């Protein structure tokens, strides 16, 4: 079945990355024969040298689950992998309760993990799929600059299969992915960018410019009583340039704005 599933997935979704969650070291050679893209290791195997070593020697990306694990356990697992491998490691954090109550998610701990280990962080969601929090809470973790968002999917949650508490039905999963993509788009990039055409238009009618408040003849020496800061259809001289015109002689007749 696994051979058929992987083959179908690759043919149907050419850009799909296939990661396999490993629980037994004896299955790794078979998994490798499927030509997968990477491995996920359960937090129960953070101290399992047989699984850690065999997966590490494949030199493929590793998603390392760290839920309900100590900092020392995580450090030891990372060191063991790095000592024998060039695998890229992503730490996958998630509260290990099914379903997870929002107050137990402890989302900010992902920042601590990222700061301490200097590695990419992913979030494993186990929130109640029968509740709105099963949608918005995992989506909210995108604001924590995670690299991977793990969400369970099931054919039918009502049948109560493995991890059904947090698993979305297919149509729900489609909606969830749409939500995630929307948030990703909204996040943008952490860099200065050119104004959009909407922002340019906003600047034109919202930003204030220096204008004259009455009809003034040329030769007049401008003072504060002659000018004001107002919105105009097009940007003129910005208010912070007022010192450039106060006390200067007007060279042309100027009508009040």
Where are these predicted regions, by residue range?
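Catalytic cores and adjacent flexible loops of soluble metabolic enzymes
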Residues: 1-257
